[in-house]
């Protein structure tokens, strides 16, 4: 009996070790966001707090699951939970094909993909600015020719469904440029591009504040800043506490249009600096930011639209 117990113990150890080896060699799981936006929550529960959102076309890694929830890591990068219905899981070959395909970005605030090239047709899904879709057509790279019909362009959704969008509402998408810490003037954003970013931010004016929001349906402070840059090909980190490390530090008395301005508590008495808010400087002492809603405020206390937390301005960065 003792001998049998020893043999059984050895067998169980072998099976356990084999299982661990297989788990260690498991291929990473990837998916593409298939809805106009997905809600990424702290825990796999609808009552859990919203952390952020990810837009259609983004590639994410699946690292866990619980029932119909999937724990993912997004490109922001951000780790959180979303429902499986918002994802289209792909194997290695499918993902490579997706990444190499010709794509477009939806550049209007809101819209739809239609079954046929008509606004009277049945909708397939909704869209928000920043959504990325594959183009249907022939050829590769600069020789690619999308399928069009009148003022419409044919697109392929992550789900595999084909549909039509208004051609004026999309532009070719060739990827994003990330802004790192202290890049200096060599890779800085041009004045022309910065004016486009500011104009994009103004498209959100009046949009309600939403904690974790990253779409024209609702944005938080860093969501507004990030979305305005993303729509113009610039990829910033998700949160204000991360953005403050991008670009170059700027003196608060030398602000220029397009600088990121940060509010919070300065480092004091051994406590580290705490960043609680970010906005986009637009000149003449004014900022556009998301606080209760996307609005324009002055940092001059003598102005009628004075931002009540202007005294908490702690830093600025130029990208």
Regions found by a protein language model. Give the residues of each.
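Bacterial Sec-dependent N-terminal signal peptides
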Residues: 1-27
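Beta-loop motif signature
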Residues: 33-62, 106-143, 209
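Catalytic cysteine-centered active-site loop
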Residues: 208-257
